[in-house]
């Protein structure tokens, strides 16, 4: 019996030429841009992409011309593959840029089971639901007969949260944190998506509560711990408070940022948080501003993913 573990994620531009592909595919996703008429959605996606392309390319140029997401995920797969497991293959696929799901699945047409693990700690229709819909379409087009199993969101998993605490501890070693504010920065969503029943905000709030308790239990006593949202786009109402607002209200001018929505570093961590918000912190006269790295391909995260995969349940697409 041949078995594969497939990690799912959104994707990120692998080159400057990929930026337009990424934006077009993302904004044409009905789970992102909720316009039912596909022709109208395609037109709106084209207009948004056209308006953002120049700025987006400039942003990518500042981080080496590409997102680190695919490279880091490939290293995570290699790390997992080096561990003893029941899997004959460990791979990854993306929604909006290569490697696309359909292309990856072609390698596993003769496999008996594929275990899906979306690399999103929290559930949202814009992430997990979208990834699974993409997978379902590819599976049907390829007429794949393999059994499909799915791993659930893991924001409340004790092992995962211990990894987060460990990364936070490493980031502030030799630092007096009694006057440092810890801000958990989550990717924002339009408020209307939450109002339609998306449970993302609920998961985020629960996650912050869990981590806040663990921090106290481990003696990591920051001045305060709070939640803020990043990556707002357009004039609609988004989840609040924004990270801009949180930094502006930070009277002690010292902040440690943890990117709560991500397991793997990407343009929204290494550009938006590390570069853009660092500039804002400097303008606000911060004396300490630091962003914690995501778990990425660390040994403990690779081991966690492998252990988590054992709890996958058969899933009907």
From Swiss-Prot:
Binding residue positions for Fe cation: 187, 268
Cross-referenced CDD domains: Ferrochelatase_C, Ferrochelatase_N
Keyword list, A-Z: Cytoplasm, Heme biosynthesis, Iron, Lyase, Metal-binding, Porphyrin biosynthesis
One cellular component term from this protein's GO annotations in UniProt: cytoplasm
Pfam family, one: Ferrochelatase
Keyword Cytoplasm attached: yes
InterPro entries, per the entry: Ferrochelatase, Ferrochelatase_AS, Ferrochelatase_C, Ferrochelatase_N
GO MF, any single term: ferrochelatase activity
Principal location class: cytoplasm
One biological process term in Gene Ontology: heme biosynthetic process
Keyword Lyase: yes
Subcellular location: Cytoplasm
Catalysed reactions, semicolon-separated: heme b + 2 H(+) = protoporphyrin IX + Fe(2+)
Signal peptide: none
Pathway linked to the protein: Porphyrin-containing compound metabolism; protoheme biosynthesis; protoheme from protoporphyrin-IX: step 1/1
E.C. numbers: 4.98.1.1
Family listed: Belongs to the ferrochelatase family.
Task of the protein: Catalyzes the ferrous insertion into protoporphyrin IX.
Protein name: Ferrochelatase
Source organism of the structure: Campylobacter concisus (strain 13826)
Encoding gene, per UniProt annotation: hemH
């Amino acid at each position: 019996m041949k078995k594969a573990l497939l990690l799912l994620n959104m994707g990120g531009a692998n080159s400057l030429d990929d930026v337009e592909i990424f934006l077009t595919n993302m904004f044409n996703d009905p789970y992102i841009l909720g316009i039912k008429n596909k022709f109208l959605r395609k037109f709106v996606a084209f207009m948004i992409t056209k308006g953002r392309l120049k700025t987006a390319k400039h942003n990518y140029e500042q981080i080496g011309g590409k997102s680190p997401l695919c490279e880091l995920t490939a290293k995570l797969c290699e790390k997992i593959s080096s561990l003893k497991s029941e899997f004959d293959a460990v791979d990854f696929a993306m929604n909006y840029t290569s490697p696309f799901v359909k292309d990856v699945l072609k390698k596993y047409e003769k496999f008996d089971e594929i275990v899906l693990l979306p690399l999103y700690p929290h559930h949202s229709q814009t992430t997990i639901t979208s990834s699974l819909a993409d997978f379902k379409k590819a599976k049907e087009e390829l007429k794949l007969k393999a059994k499909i199993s799915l791993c659930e969101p893991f924001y409340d998993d004790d092992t995962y949260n211990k990894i987060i605490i460990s990364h936070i501890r490493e980031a502030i070693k030799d630092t007096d944190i009694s006057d440092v504010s810890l801000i958990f920065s989550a990717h924002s969503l339009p408020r209307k998506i939450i109002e339609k029943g998306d449970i993302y905000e609920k998961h985020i709030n629960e996650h912050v509560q869990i981590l806040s308790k663990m921090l106290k239990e481990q003696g990591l006593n920051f001045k305060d711990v709070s939640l803020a949202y990043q990556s707002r786009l357009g004039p609609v109402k988004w989840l609040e408070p924004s990270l801009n607002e949180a930094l502006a209200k930070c009277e002690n001018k010292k902040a440690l940022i943890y990117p709560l929505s991500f397991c793997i570093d990407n343009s929204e961590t290494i550009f938006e948080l590390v570069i853009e918000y660092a500039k804002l912190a400097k303008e606000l006269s911060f004396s300490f501003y630091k962003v914690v790295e995501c778990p990425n391909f660390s040994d403990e995260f690779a081991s966690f993913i492998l252990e988590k995969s054992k709890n996958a349940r058969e899933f009907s697409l």
